[in-house]
């Protein structure tokens, strides 16, 4: 689900252990005395981060994560410590709970932030995923184009200077800023002084975190390619990146009070003015958009309430003890998951950051990797990350609102993109992506032939109709051409090693084998 970056401290198994069951390595780095001992390595990390020009806020956030790693903090959330959420505000109630009024004054105090640091490496891309074309049509708009067009349309419709920011990475900044300058230069024009030659700030950069050597908990070294010594710190870095870059203070100085934050690859995540009014009218410090879990969401995380103080908490799969697995998977008990569409009150955020030395106390997500991800023979390291949705537990009076599934349409795989490019989705005159099907069709493509974007593109001459299809599974190397319509639950299986074309036609609840015997 959105917000799940990886296992929570897999270095300690991601599960509960008694002291007697700790391994030698875990024992070496657990307990108060060992914590002091292992934290002796901290000055090396601080020196390394300062030499790279990272902010005090970024360093403080990493130090908090490193301290948890050294303490053996597994992040387990026991069922006995939480309560299921019985009722939340619905999307319809939120949209009708405020007085009808002009949205322009609120929009002038709002900024749209898109997390845009991903390269889409899981799809074989070496450029920003947001530069992928959404529809195979004449417009050829990318994710970033639609985001920019949505902002421009909202400014025009409401006569308001809605702010727009990308949280880029060092890997995506150059390409995406070049694209904006070439195709959407008006977004970089100053909002307050049209005569100024300075560009309007539309980006801030995510930080980077040093990888931790597994065996010693020292800073990891990779002499042949020092860039492998660093990793993205997860989207929980939003908060120290905003604070440490000065962007948070600049927004507040400019009169901006509200943020709407979402992933750039979630085409369902558009700024809804009624949700903005609901958020502002109730003076919530933080609001999360959630969806109802279905059977396909059983393994994904859910939100709940902490029994001790009633605050919302995110619990991911790796934070669940084995004994609680049945409770975790019970979607009638734990009903909601995080979409990663978040609303943040900047004044409350700044207060929380300053209270915690520039870094919110977020649960640690610890990924075990090879220092060179392309070489399994290289030493093991820990990558320390956090998730931005976990910040919901940092605020009193935080809120969650149940939104329709149409506001959660992420593109993580080529199957997701295949679905989005079909007629199950359309693009409106306001450049929003609209679900035309009753429910999003599930698309499972053979990873041997479709996992990489270029491979999928080479096998699709025309995307099939999926508007009345609930599930499509493709096995083998199948070429899709014009005139193919799927309905209900369908599968296509190429039984040979050679590419096989699927003939045009309508297929309803069909299990198709290629080559056809007829």
Where are these regions (language model features)?
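Conserved N-terminal catalytic core of the sugar/cofactor nucleotidyltransferase
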Residues: 2-114, 122-258, 468, 496, ...
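Left-handed beta-helix
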Residues: 4-108, 277-518
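Hydrophobic/aromatic beta-strand patches that form the interior of the parallel beta-sheet core
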Residues: 113, 132, 165, 203-205, ...
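Conserved S/T- and glycine-rich ATP-binding loop of Class I adenylate-forming
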Residues: 1, 118, 480
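Conserved short loop/turn motifs at secondary-structure junctions
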Residues: 163-172, 264-267, 405-409, 413
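Residues immediately flanking
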Residues: 116-117, 264, 346, 414
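Short His-Asn-centered micro-motif
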Residues: 115, 166-170, 207, 262-264, ...
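Conserved core of the sugar-phosphate nucleotidyltransferase
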Residues: 161, 175-346, 350-357
């Amino acid at each position: 689900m959105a917000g799940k970056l990886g296992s929570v401290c897999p270095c300690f198994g991601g599960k509960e252990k008694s002291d007697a069951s700790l391994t030698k390595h875990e024992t070496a780095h657990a307990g108060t005395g060992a914590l002091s001992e292992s934290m002796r390595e901290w000055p090396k990390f601080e020196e390394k981060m300062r030499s790279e020009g990272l902010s005090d806020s970024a360093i403080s956030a990493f130090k908090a994560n490193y301290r948890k790693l050294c303490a053996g903090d597994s992040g387990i959330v026991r069922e006995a410590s939480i309560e299921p959420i019985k009722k939340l505000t619905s999307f319809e109630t939120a949209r009708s709970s405020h007085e009808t009024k002009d949205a322009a004054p609120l929009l002038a105090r709002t900024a749209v932030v898109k997390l845009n640091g991903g390269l889409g490496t899981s799809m074989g891309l070496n450029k920003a995923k947001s530069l992928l074309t959404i529809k195979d049509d004449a417009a050829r708009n990318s994710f970033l184009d639609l985001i920019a067009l949505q902002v421009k349309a909202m400014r025009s419709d409401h006569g308001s200077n809605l702010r727009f920011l990308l949280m880029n990475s060092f890997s995506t900044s150059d390409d995406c800023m070049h694209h904006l300058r070439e195709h959407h230069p008006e977004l970089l024009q100053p909002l307050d002084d049209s005569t100024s030659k300075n560009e309007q700030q539309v980006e801030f950069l995510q930080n980077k975190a040093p990888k931790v050597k597994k065996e010693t908990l020292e800073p990891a070294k990779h002499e042949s390619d020092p860039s492998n010594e660093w990793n993205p710190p997860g989207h929980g870095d939003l908060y120290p990146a905003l604070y440490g870059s000065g962007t948070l203070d600049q927004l507040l100085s400019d009169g901006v009070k509200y943020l709407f934050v979402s992933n750039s690859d979630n085409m369902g995540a558009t700024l809804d003015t009624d949700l903005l009014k609901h958020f502002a009218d109730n003076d919530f410090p933080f609001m999360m958009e959630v969806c109802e879990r279905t059977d396909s969401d059983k393994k994904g995380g859910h939100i709940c309430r902490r029994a001790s103080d009633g605050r919302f908490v995110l619990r991911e799969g790796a934070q669940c003890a084995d004994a609680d697995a049945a409770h975790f998977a019970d979607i009638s008990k734990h009903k909601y998951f995080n979409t990663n569409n978040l609303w943040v009150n900047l004044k409350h955020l700044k207060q929380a950051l300053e209270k915690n030395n520039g870094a919110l106390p977020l649960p640690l997500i610890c990924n075990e990797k090879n220092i060179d991800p392309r070489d399994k023979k290289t030493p093991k390291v820990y990558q320390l990350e956090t998730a931005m949705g976990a910040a919901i537990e940092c605020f009193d009076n935080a809120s969650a609102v149940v939104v329709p599934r149409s506001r959660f349409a992420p593109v993580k795989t080529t199957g997701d993109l295949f679905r989005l490019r079909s007629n199950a989705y359309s693009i409106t005159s306001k450049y929003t992506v609209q679900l035309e099907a009753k429910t999003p069709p599930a698309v499972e493509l053979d990873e041997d032939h479709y996992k990489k974007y270029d491979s999928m593109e080479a096998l699709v001459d025309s995307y099939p109709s999926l508007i009345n299809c609930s599930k499509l599974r493709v096995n083998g190397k199948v070429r899709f051409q014009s005139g193919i319509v799927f309905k209900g639950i369908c599968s296509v299986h190429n039984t040979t090693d050679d590419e096989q074309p699927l003939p045009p036609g309508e297929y309803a609840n069909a299990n198709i084998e290629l080559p056809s015997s007829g």
